[in-house]
Design a protein with these regions (language model features):
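S-adenosylmethionine/decaboxylated-SAM
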Residues: 1-178
Length: 178
């Protein structure tokens, strides 16, 4: 992709990883959005050798103001991949899906990460509502009302495993724009 957008910055590790991929490919841009970027994390990201590949935006990821700021960094015709990894409640992920789906290029994805929560609702430190209140439920609901997106796990092109199903923290996460 030309642009990788990720909601949820935390320590910035995935932003740095994506920036490294962009550098290796010789092109691309990473936009990281968070409601509150901790000052020490911002300093570390901005001091990193890959910082020039990253734009940080602070604010509510689903707000019109933040979405408009993100759009200002995307040129027309750019291939865009969106990863939603901030607040994992179903309601918030649905708001992000609605806010960002228009930026996703045909053939690319918007990914609602950490849907595995639904399978962890009954473990220590889990929450009973995770069974229905999770990113996978949001992605499935979104796909039902947006026929231009299909839930489609990317193929495993180099798997030597005998597994027949993907082992993932991101079930029902990959929404491909058709």
């Amino acid at each position: 992709p030309d642009v990788i957008i990720e909601t949820g910055v935390a320590h910035g590790g995935s932003l740095i990883f994506y920036a490294g991929l962009c550098k290796a490919m010789g092109s691309g841009r990473v936009i990281g959005i968070d409601i509150a970027i901790r000052p020490h994390n911002r300093r570390a990201i901005e001091a990193h050798e890959l910082a020039s590949w990253i734009t940080l935006i602070e604010g509510d990821s689903s707000s019109r103001e933040v979405v408009d700021r993100v759009k200002a960094h995307i040129t027309e015709g750019a291939t865009t991949l969106v990863l939603l990894d901030s607040n994992h409640s179903k309601a918030h992920v649905l708001k992000e899906l609605e806010a960002y789906h228009g930026l996703v290029s045909p053939g690319s994805y918007i990914v609602a990460t950490d849907g595995l929560m639904r399978d962890l609702h009954d473990v220590p430190r889990g929450a009973p509502d995770w069974e229905w209140n999770n990113p996978a439920a949001a992605a499935e609901e979104f796909a039902r009302s947006h026929p231009e997106f299909v839930i489609e796990q990317p193929a495993w092109p180099f798997s030597e495993s005998e597994l027949t199903e993907n082992v993932t923290h991101w079930p029902s996460a990959w929404l491909r724009r058709v």
